[in-house]
Amino acid sequence: MLTIALSKGRILDDTLPLLAAAGIVPSENPDKSRKLIIPTSLSDVRLLIVRATDVPTYVEHGAADLGVAGKDVLMEYGGQGLYEPLDLRIANCKLMTAGAIGAPEPKGRLRVATKFVNVAKRYYAEQGRQVDVIKLYGSMELAPLVGLADKIIDVVDTGNTLRANGLEPQELIATISSRLVVNKASMKMQHGRIQSLIDTLRDAVEARHRH
C-alpha cells in the first residue's frame, strides 16, 4: 500500500491532475468528503488529507510514504528524514518580507511577525541582524499596522492583500512551489513502485509546461 499525504486547497486542486496522469483518481472528491483517508482507483494507493504544515511530519515518520508540500512549509520544517525528488511546479508564489509603505528602515533590533519562525531566524542571522520573531498564525498584515512588528514574513501571490492594508512587499527570501516528498525508508522498501510514480509525475509536469 502506498499512502500519499495531501492538503486541501490550491495544492490539492493542482496535484490531482498530475496524479490522474499516473492513474490515481480519488474515489470521492476530497474537497467535499469528510473522510480523511480516501481510497483511489488503484487498490494499493490511498490519500491522506492533512493540514499543509503537517504533511512533512506524516511523511518523515512513515505514516505516509509520499506527500506534496509547499517549499515554504519544507523550509520551515527542516525535516531530515525526507527526500525531495521533484518540483511539481504548482502553487507558485514567493516568500517575502513586507512592511508599511514608505516606512523608514528601523534602526537597531527588528521585530518580525510571521508563522515562518525558523525561516525568519535563519534569514536575519545570515544578514547579521538582531531580530525578535513574533509567531502569528494568520492575519500577518495586521502586525505592522498596530505596532506589533516592524515587518512581516509571509507568502505573497499577487501582493494585493498587502497593498490593500498599506503594506508593500520588500525582500525576496525564496521562490516557492510545491514539491513531492518521499519517506527515506519507503524509498528503500518500495523503490521500484515509488520511482515509477516519480517518473510518471515528472513526465506529467513537463507535459503540462510544454503547452
Swiss-Prot record:
InterPro entries named in the record: ATP_PRibTrfase_cat (IPR013820), ATP_PRibTrfase_CS (IPR018198), ATP_PRibTrfase_HisG (IPR001348), ATP_PRibTrfase_HisG_short (IPR024893)
Enzyme Commission number(s) from the entry: 2.4.2.17
Xref: Pfam families: HisG (PF01634)
The UniProt record lists the keyword Cell inner membrane: no
Described purpose of this protein according to its UniProt entry: Catalyzes the condensation of ATP and 5-phosphoribose 1-diphosphate to form N'-(5'-phosphoribosyl)-ATP (PR-ATP). Has a crucial role in the pathway because the rate of histidine biosynthesis seems to be controlled primarily by regulation of HisG enzymatic activity.
Compartments where located: Cytoplasm
Protein's recorded name: ATP phosphoribosyltransferase
GO BP, sorted A to Z: L-histidine biosynthetic process
Catalytic activity: 1-(5-phospho-beta-D-ribosyl)-ATP + diphosphate = 5-phospho-alpha-D-ribose 1-diphosphate + ATP
Domain commentary: Lacks the C-terminal regulatory region which is replaced by HisZ.
Pathway(s) served: Amino-acid biosynthesis; L-histidine biosynthesis; L-histidine from 5-phospho-alpha-D-ribose 1-diphosphate: step 1/9
Keywords tagged on the record: Amino-acid biosynthesis, ATP-binding, Cytoplasm, Glycosyltransferase, Histidine biosynthesis, Nucleotide-binding, Transferase
